[in-house]
A protein has these predicted regions:
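Chalcogenol-based redox active-site neighborhoods
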Residues: 1-180
Length: 180
């Protein structure tokens, strides 16, 4: 698994634009969103129980991530058509404002394989979060088992702390003081 300090290698995944436009699909690579931080959130599967709670909770903070020059990307190994169908079928997902992705490739350009979060026994991604700086260097990684959801507020808190470039105490709140 890639970890803090590792750089993203070339990859290509299918992005799904927010708001279900006609031209919803596009390619996301390591060069997409130049100059931005990337918060990459993997979840196991579309049409499940825990996953939409995470996606909706992350989306509620989408503007907070954007305010920090970060692009929020949530996705799984389900294909792009599955994502659009899920967004159409699930009332809360119809309103999401962030980019989703389908990581269906295997091999050289597979992001999930590069990051090491494909969980073969389930045929799905682990609940993994990567915060990647504008130079494509991983600054933070968390990985949960399939049954435990994450705290988007904690992800935002860590992003905010990383962006200070300073020492940050435990439980430092977003925008809080750093250690001098």
């Amino acid at each position: 698994m890639k970890t803090v300090g590792d750089k993203l290698a070339p990859f290509a995944i299918t992005g799904v634009k927010p708001g279900q436009p006609e031209d919803a699909f596009y390619t996301i690579t390591e060069n997409s969103f130049e100059g931005k931080w990337k918060v990459i959130v993997y979840y196991p599967k579309d049409f499940t129980f825990v996953c939409p709670t995470e996606i909706v909770a992350y989306d509620k903070l989408a503007q907070d991530f954007e305010d920090r020059d970060a692009v929020l990307l949530t996705g799984s190994t389900d294909n792009e058509f599955c994502k659009v169908a899920w967004q159409t079928a699930h009332a809360d997902l119809k309103k999401i404002r962030h980019h989703q992705f389908a990581d269906t490739q295997r091999g050289e350009l597979s992001l999930i394989e590069q990051l090491g979060v494909f969980y073969a026994p389930a045929g799905a991604a682990l609940r993994a979060t990567f915060i990647v700086d504008p130079n494509n260097e991983i600054q933070h990684v968390t990985v949960n088992n399939l049954n435990v959801g994450r705290s988007p507020e904690e992800t935002l808190r860590i992003l905010d702390a990383l962006q200070t470039g300073e020492l940050c105490a435990c439980n430092r709140t977003v925008g809080g003081e750093t250690l001098k």
